[in-house]
């Protein structure tokens, strides 16, 4: 997607966590294109949030069509999110959101829901009058605070993420974290 997405934000955090300093992040709008890029040697890895509506399709396509596998998983909070509305709109009627975020709020308050492929497209649509409100980053509202306001703070979401690559890490056995960060309530089993 465009610059500033949670995918870019979280990918940067993941690379730093793994100590990878020389990687270049290339943003794409279509995960199937990303798989083709890995297959053709144009990319080494791809990161996808596991709550993305196309995730199951991407995992299956990666495995069965390209021989690409999920090689790592992790959990990371998103950017701070909220319902951002154009100033001057008293009763918002339209709400833009990325389909994976639909359960973050009660959408019944709006007459129409408009789906977009990235929350980073929402501020532009708000500023252009395409919709009244949108579920996007709070930093977008801050950047355009003269034109946009925050109606609801959603906060961050701890999302699961998948890393795709060519080298399969599972040889038929369970692969799980042994980093010692397992939540305490899971340790009692």
Feature-to-residue mapping (PLM):
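Domain-level signature for soluble enzymes in the chorismate/prephenate branch of the shikimate pathway
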Residues: 1-189
């Amino acid at each position: 997607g465009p610059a500033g997405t949670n995918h870019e934000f979280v990918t940067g955090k993941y690379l730093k966590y793994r100590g990878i300093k020389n990687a270049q992040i290339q943003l794409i709008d279509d995960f199937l294109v990303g798989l083709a890029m890995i297959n053709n040697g144009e990319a080494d890895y791809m990161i996808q949030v596991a709550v993305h509506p196309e995730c199951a399709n991407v995992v299956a396509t990666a495995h069965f069509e390209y021989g690409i596998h999920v090689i790592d998983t992790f959990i990371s909070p998103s950017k701070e999110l909220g319902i951002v509305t154009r100033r001057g709109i008293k009763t918002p009627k339209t709400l833009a959101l990325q389909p994976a975020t639909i359960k973050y709020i009660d959408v019944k308050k709006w007459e129409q829901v408009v789906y977009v492929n990235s929350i980073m497209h929402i501020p532009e649509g708000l500023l252009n009058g395409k919709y009244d409100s949108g579920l996007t980053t709070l930093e977008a509202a801050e950047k355009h605070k003269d034109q946009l306001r925050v109606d609801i703070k959603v906060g961050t979401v701890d999302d699961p993420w998948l890393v795709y690559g060519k080298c399969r890490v599972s040889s038929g056995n369970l692969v799980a974290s042994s980093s010692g960060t397992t939540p305490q309530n899971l340790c009692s089993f």
